[in-house]
């Protein structure tokens, strides 16, 4: 079997496992989001970490995505601001609290926080700050990765908390320790990371299920259409005024 096929099979197996084990929680997450949308309230998605940020971008200003999604795109942990800088900031105690404060999350809001490892300081502090403010929290992370990471690892929050232990609803992404899944003969380090596929699948599944739940109540939530198709700009423009000024990065 060639390596591309091996990687393909790994990706498919991960997605199957998510479907088999996390469907109920994905439905619960969709219910939480649908309640926000029915009240015309935003829900926030934060991926504190270099590649975890991709998860928040996946649901934001995205064709087929809910317009009520507000991505927390803090420059501190974006790779475009410097990869090593991003890593150091996501390990900085207190930083996550500053980010939540900057987006002014408040009681009754909903935060989805995505981090494959679920241990770093920015992740844990963001959840702790959100909970202090009465914000509902959903976490997407690997329980296995967090549980197998030693307490003295430098990325860990001083509390030693794991994301999945402190959120209101935890969705287990099942990512193996180290993320990469493909072994190549003669190479010590594995290649072929998997977490971006899994995070995108989980988040888009939540979007789909949220929309389906709302449809059962005869509610049509505003959904982005690609600006690169005929009529896309016209479709989106009818909703922009509802969200401009509310969604920080719009």
Where do the protein language model's features map onto the residues?
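Active-site phosphate/pyrophosphate-binding segments
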Residues: 25, 39-41, 64, 212-250
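Short glycine-rich phosphate-binding loop at a beta-alpha junction
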Residues: 42-47
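A short, well-structured juxtamembrane/interface segment
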Residues: 21-36
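Generic N-terminal amphipathic, Lys/Arg-enriched alpha-helix
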Residues: 1-20
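Glycine-rich phosphate-binding loops that contact phosphosugars or nucleotide phosphates
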Residues: 48-201, 207
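Conserved, well-structured ligand/cofactor-binding cores
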Residues: 8, 93-97, 121, 243-245, ...
């Amino acid at each position: 079997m060639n390596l591309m096929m091996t990687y393909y099979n790994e990706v498919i197996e991960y997605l199957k496992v998510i479907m088999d084990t996390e469907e109920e929680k994905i439905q619960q997450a969709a219910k939480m989001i649908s309640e926000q949308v029915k009240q015309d309230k935003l829900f926030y998605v934060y991926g504190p970490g270099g590649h975890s940020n991709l998860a928040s971008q996946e649901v934001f200003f995205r064709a087929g995505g809910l317009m009520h999604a507000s991505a927390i795109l803090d420059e501190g942990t974006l790779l475009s601001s410097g990869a090593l800088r991003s890593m150091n900031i996501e390990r900085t105690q207190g930083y996550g609290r500053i980010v939540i404060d900057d987006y002014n999350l408040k009681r009754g809001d909903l935060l989805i926080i995505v981090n494959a490892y679920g241990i770093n300081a920015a992740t844990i502090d963001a959840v702790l700050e959100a909970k202090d403010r009465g914000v509902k929290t959903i976490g997407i992370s690997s329980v296995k990765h967090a549980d197998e990471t030693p307490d003295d690892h430098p990325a860990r929050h001083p509390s030693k908390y794991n994301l999945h232990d402190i959120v209101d609803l935890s969705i287990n992404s099942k990512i193996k320790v180290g993320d990469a899944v493909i072994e190549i003969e003669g190479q010590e380090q594995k290649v072929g990371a998997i977490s971006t596929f899994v995070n995108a699948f989980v988040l888009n599944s939540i979007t789909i299920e949220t929309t389906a739940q709302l449809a059962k109540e005869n509610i049509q939530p505003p959904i982005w259409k690609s600006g690169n198709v005929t009529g896309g700009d016209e479709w989106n423009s009818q909703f922009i005024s509802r969200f401009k000024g509310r969604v920080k990065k719009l």
